[in-house]
A protein has these predicted regions:
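N-terminal cysteine/histidine-rich coordination modules
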Residues: 1-143
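Amphipathic alpha-helical repeat scaffolds of TPR domains
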Residues: 142-218, 246-261, 298-307
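TPR/TPR-like (Sel1-like) alpha-helical repeat modules
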Residues: 266-284
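Alpha-helical junction/boundary sensor with strong preference for TPR arrays
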Residues: 143-144, 182-185, 189-192, 233, ...
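Alpha-helical linker/edge segments of TPR/alpha-solenoid repeat scaffolds
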Residues: 3-49, 211-218, 254-271, 293-320
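Acidic, Ser/Thr-rich low-complexity linear motifs
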Residues: 84-88, 283-296
Length: 320
């Protein structure tokens, strides 16, 4: 007897009461009903959500409304983290983790940091990329906005199985939803990189590392995301696309760390040598301009050297 897909979907909607869960069920198990699979889907979603917000305490997040600079949709929820509500620690790839403090509960803010337009799927964790109250315009230039308008179809293809986009990206978010939000942010940042906007390649690397951490936290293989981040950071260094010296030094440090993690000690050592070259060049410049300093260069050089000294430790990147 032929499978009645419509009837299966109807019953799944009744049992799961969530169109996105129904689509996920069908993607994993096909158009057949199995109580064990339904239970597994529910448990996976509950577990993913519970890891995002833990413990008792006040809510560390407040919501503001923004408007999309690409399609004009307004009243999009943007989740902001309250000042001093979380102790923020960064791993060896400079990706933050969060611990509640001062009476606030622990929340993995990285999971909800990216704001997503439910209409055109423009996405960014930076509220300056959005239109806000008092006629505050997006910092993204008009030519990039036009390109993003033309690429709506590409972004929709990334979440084509999602029935209710607004609900899917609402709070709390499961791990798969968080990854999807960063994939959409990567789509935006690639357009910025095409127009050679400052920090675009740095953002691409940072978003890839957020995905890598989420995958790592869910016990998955994050190697490809780490490789993606390394590639973006190398291109950022090659093109000098980071005007801030602090960010540029972070990029070089991250290249060293990622190279060691991925087993390329030769590359890591070559970028550690970059720090030495930059220090020497700055020392020469300081003879002409005493206001210049090597402080930032030396700070990140020292962090890279510490990793290099521990390069043979098996547990060096156990949390990354």
């Amino acid at each position: 007897m032929a499978i009645d897909v419509v009837e299966v979907k109807r019953r799944l909607h009744s049992l799961l009461n969530d169109a996105n869960l129904v689509n996920e069920y069908l993607r994993q198990y096909g158009p057949t009903l199995d109580i064990k699979h339904i239970k597994a889907i529910k448990e996976a979603r509950a577990k993913a959500v519970s890891t995002a917000e833990e413990g008792e305490g006040r809510d560390p997040v407040f919501e503001i409304k923004v408007a999309c600079p690409v399609c004009g949709l307004d009243d999009i929820p943007c989740y902001e983290l309250r000042a001093k509500s979380q102790q923020i620690l960064k791993n060896k790839f400079l990706v933050p983790s969060y611990q509640g403090t001062s009476g606030y509960k622990t929340l993995d803010y990285s999971l909800i940091a990216v704001t997503v337009c439910p209409r055109c799927l423009f996405a960014s964790p930076d509220k300056k990329d959005w239109c806000r109250q008092e006629e505050a315009k997006s910092q993204i230039p008009a030519n990039a906005i036009m390109n993003l308008q033309e690429k709506i179809g590409e972004r929709k293809a990334l979440v084509k199985t999602i029935a209710n986009v607004a609900a899917y990206f609402s709070r709390p978010r499961c791990l798969d939803t968080a990854i999807a939000s960063y994939q959409l942010a990567i789509s935006r940042a690639r357009v910025e990189a095409w127009y050679e906007l400052p920090y675009a390649l740095y953002k691409l690397g940072a978003y890839s590392l957020r995905i890598a951490k989420i995958i790592k936290d869910s016990k998955g293989d994050n190697t490809q995301s780490l490789r993606d981040a390394l590639g973006y950071y190398e291109e950022a260094f090659r093109t000098s696309s980071c005007p801030s010296e602090e960010i540029e030094m972070q990029v070089i440090y991250a290249i060293c760390a990622l190279s060691l993690k991925l087993g390329d000690q030769k590359k890591a050592h070559s970028y550690i040598s970059v720090f030495a070259n930059l220090h020497n060049s700055r020392a020469v410049e300081m003879k002409e301009d005493p206001k210049l300093q090597t402080t930032i260069i030396d700070k990140w050089a020292e962090r890279a050297k510490l990793l290099w000294e521990d390069r043979d430790r098996e547990d060096l990147f156990k949390d990354e």
